[in-house]
Amino acid sequence: MTDSFPFSVQESVPLSRFSTFRIGGPARYFKELTSVSEALTVFSYLHTHPLPYIIIGKGSNCLFDDQGFDGLVLYNNIQGQEFLSDTQIKVLSGSSFALLGKRLSSQGFSGLEFAVGIPGTVGGAVFMNAGTTLANTAFSLINVEIIDHSGILLSIPREKLLFSYRTSPFQKKPAFIASATFQLTKDPQAAKRAKALIEERILKQPYEYPSAGCIFRNPEGLSAGALIDRAGLKGLKIGGGQISEKHGNFIINTGNACTADILELIEIIQKTLKKQGISLHKEVRIIPFRL
């Protein structure tokens, strides 16, 4: 069947290898993207050959099904960057967002210090408008290049894109994010701030276990983690999944968790908080076996 594709495709690739949860069955088809030109070829093909597909980066915000995915998984590994001016940098979407923040802050550039503790790709950060309480991706963003559903490369300035808390226009109108350009400022204190941010995250978050980061978006003016803590749910365990004792908004894989374990814990949290009149909305992407 892979012979029918005009590009190389693998079959039955375990998605647990591409998830920070370390959970997930095999992808029916799997394609690693390593250049924008390759991505253009793939999306042009998909425009005329409908096939269920998903795009993943580092899998840091995904929960795959134990059965895997019955379609094509596109793994974005398109990396690279270039300075367009002294304080503007264009970054390809498969690049590590955390490493980008670390490198730039160590070189005396401010604007993306918050990225040091966010374990996804640049494309994923734009898609989710990833951030912290201090800043988010859209703050420093000045341009995005995308490949639209018909396989055409487009350049979109920031002012034409509407972002909000953990929300981008690409969540409602899917497109492949090819690159992002950021505006930086020179600041010798940037490295110090980045170091403090990562130290705080290590102290407060369960990095020693596989997880997908924060499971829920924070309700306006509230902390989802604190709400879960006050509800007495920290430490609750089902199968190999557990609500972290370190941070209530993290569900961790203690070693042998399956998708059902994680979903059951998510449901328990939502139902418990709903009884208190609080609706928690998932930040993690739940990717089913079939779309």
Curated annotation (Swiss-Prot):
Belongs to the MurB family. Pathway: Cell wall biogenesis; peptidoglycan biosynthesis. It catalyses: UDP-N-acetyl-alpha-D-muramate + NADP(+) = UDP-N-acetyl-3-O-(1-carboxyvinyl)-alpha-D-glucosamine + NADPH + H(+). InterPro entries: FAD-bd_PCMH, FAD-bd_PCMH-like_sf, FAD-bd_PCMH_sub1, FAD-bd_PCMH_sub2, MurB, MurB_C, MurB_C_sf, Oxid_FAD_bind_N. This is UDP-N-acetylenolpyruvoylglucosamine reductase. Its cofactor is FAD. Residues 22-187 form the FAD-binding PCMH-type domain. Gene3D superfamilies: 3.30.465.10, UDP-N-acetylenolpyruvoylglucosamine reductase, C-terminal domain, Uridine Diphospho-n-acetylenolpyruvylglucosamine Reductase, domain 2. The keyword Protein biosynthesis does not apply. GO terms for biological process: cell division; cell wall organization; peptidoglycan biosynthetic process; regulation of cell shape. The active site is at residues 166, 214, 283. GO terms for molecular function: FAD binding; flavin adenine dinucleotide binding; UDP-N-acetylmuramate dehydrogenase activity.
